[in-house]
Swiss-Prot record:
Reported tissue expression: Expressed in shoot meristem and flowers.
Keyword Repeat: yes
GN (gene name): UBA2B
Function: Heterogeneous nuclear ribonucleoprotein (hnRNP)-like protein that acts as a component of a complex regulating the turnover of mRNAs in the nucleus. Binds with high affinity to RNA molecules that contain U-rich sequences in 3'-UTRs. May function in complex with UBP1 and contribute to the stabilization of mRNAs in the nucleus.
Name of the protein this chain belongs to: UBP1-associated protein 2B
Assigned GO CC terms: nucleus
Domain called RRM: residue spans: 128-236, 227-314
GO biological process: cell death; defense response; ethylene biosynthetic process; leaf senescence
Stretch list, region Disordered: 1-86, 302-335, 423-451
UniProt feature, compositional bias: Polar residues: 67-77
Disulfide bonds: none
Length: 451
């Protein structure tokens, strides 16, 4: 029993704390409560921060979704964005005019772009290299340098020469150190180097077509034709420079004299001048014939040049030739041509006779032919010749020559027994050319009177 009581007392002691312990616990409780409260507050702050971050992330996600839907609504299916596409791929399909417009706008808005364009242009040979043509065969590189050094500093000069003879081929190249030098040189494209009037252009334009002196006029311009005059009868001993001074009295000359001989630099019988104004060209043509150093110069418009003059002369000669044949046709000849055509003319003349005229001629010969030594048979033969000429025989051998009756030896006393008229020219015997002359005489209307 005692043991049970002891155990119960011990269990009560363990189950119920002592007063000291209770007091100590009461002292420690406020501190623990404060710590717990702080922990609770910290946990609430952390939870609030996490909630804010979650809300912000959700808001950003919604904004991104809205942006993607708005931008992707018009460009669905495009994997690459425009900003990521290379700029050269965008410029490649553009035309030259579009690129020029873009570069011009960029150069106007951004000065650094304009400076960059100028730097590239100065470095490129395209804007600094010029081509000179029309040089004399004795031209050297020093002559080119002396002629072009006034326009700017020259970097390189080359006069193209023949490898065999060592003489100039008539052209060369000038390379300036700056673009301004080439521009100054091209302000006046024609220059006199030595005794030759030369012309220059940018080498990038390409080779010159046709006459090297006329070549600077690259494109056809009706206004240039109106301002260009053609001067003929220009002797080779005329100085081109003096000729230029002579025609400069009528106005300022833009080009000329053109058309000089490439080898000698002298005129080849003509010269071309292009005035700067139409009034000057008209003034030069007011007096078409001008006297210069004892020579009479003939001035025309450029389109009245040698080709047109030759064509006019050809037409004039053809007209004169036709006129001569026309006059001969009035005398009995036909259209111009060989002897066959002339014979056709006789046939045309024969057609003018009608049977009444033939009968009258026969009666005349019958009444007066005795005094002339002719008989009636000649009139009948002549009537047969004139009357049987058919209109269908025009252009060939006259019908009368093949269908005329045989003439007896007594008709033409001078011919005797020859068979010249038998069968016409086709049956003429060898060695009897006189019958041909007699046939012409009869055909022209006059009988052969004998010797």
């Amino acid at each position: 029993m005692t043991k049970k009581r002891k155990l119960e007392s011990e269990s009560n002691e363990t189950s119920e704390p002592t007063e000291k312990q209770q007091q100590q616990c009461e002292k420690e409780d406020p501190e623990i409560r404060n710590v717990d409260n702080q922990r609770d507050d910290d946990e609430q702050v952390v939870e609030q921060d996490t909630l804010k971050e979650m809300h912000e992330e959700e808001a950003k996600g919604e904004d991104n979704i809205e942006a993607e839907t708005s931008s992707g609504s018009g460009n669905q299916g495009n994997e690459d964005d425009d900003e990521e596409e290379p700029i050269e791929d965008l410029l490649e399909p553009f035309s030259k005019d579009q690129l020029l417009i873009l570069l011009k706008e960029a150069a106007e808005r951004h000065r650094d772009v304009a400076n960059r364009i100028r730097i590239v242009a100065d470095e490129d040979l395209v804007h600094r290299k010029i081509f000179v043509h029309g040089l004399g065969w004795d031209t050297k590189a020093d002559s080119l340098i002396d002629a072009f050094k006034q326009y700017g500093e020259i970097e390189d000069c080359k006069c193209v020469v023949d490898k065999v003879s060592g003489q100039s081929k008539g052209y060369g190249f000038i390379l300036f150190k700056s673009r301004s030098g080439a521009r100054n040189a091209l302000k006046q494209p024609q220059k006199k180097i030595g005794t030759r009037m030369t012309a220059c252009q940018l080498a990038s334009i390409g080779p010159v077509q046709g006459n090297p002196v006329v070549a600077p006029a690259q494109h056809f311009n009706p206004e240039n034709v109106q301002r260009k005059i053609y001067v003929s009868n220009v002797s080779a001993d005329i100085d081109p420079q003096k000729l230029l001074e002579f025609f400069s009295r009528f106005g300022e000359i833009e080009e000329g004299p053109l058309g000089l001989d490439k080898a000698t630099g002298r005129p080849k019988g003509f010269a071309l001048f292009v005035y700067r104004s139409l009034e000057s060209a008209k003034k030069a043509l007011e007096e078409p014939h001008k006297t210069f150093e004892g020579h009479v110069l003939h001035c025309h418009k450029a389109n009245d040049g040698p080709k047109q003059v030759k064509q006019h002369q050809h037409n004039h000669n053809s007209h004169n030739q036709n006129s001569r044949y026309q006059r001969n046709d009035n005398n009995g000849y036909g259209a111009p041509g060989g002897h066959g055509h002339f014979i056709a003319g006789n046939n045309q003349a024969v057609q003018a006779f009608n049977p009444a005229i033939g009968q009258a001629l026969t009666a005349l010969l019958a009444s007066q032919g005795a005094g002339l030594g002719l008989n009636q048979a000649f009139g009948q033969a002549l009537l047969g010749t004139l009357g049987t000429a058919s209109p269908g025989a025009v252009g060939g051998m006259p019908s009368g020559y093949g269908t005329q009756a045989n003439i007896s030896p007594g008709v033409y006393p001078g011919y005797g027994a020859q068979a010249g008229y038998q069968g016409g020219y086709q049956t003429q015997q060898p060695g009897q050319g006189g019958a041909g002359r007699g046939q012409h005489g009869a055909g022209y209307g006059g009988p052969y009177m004998g010797r």
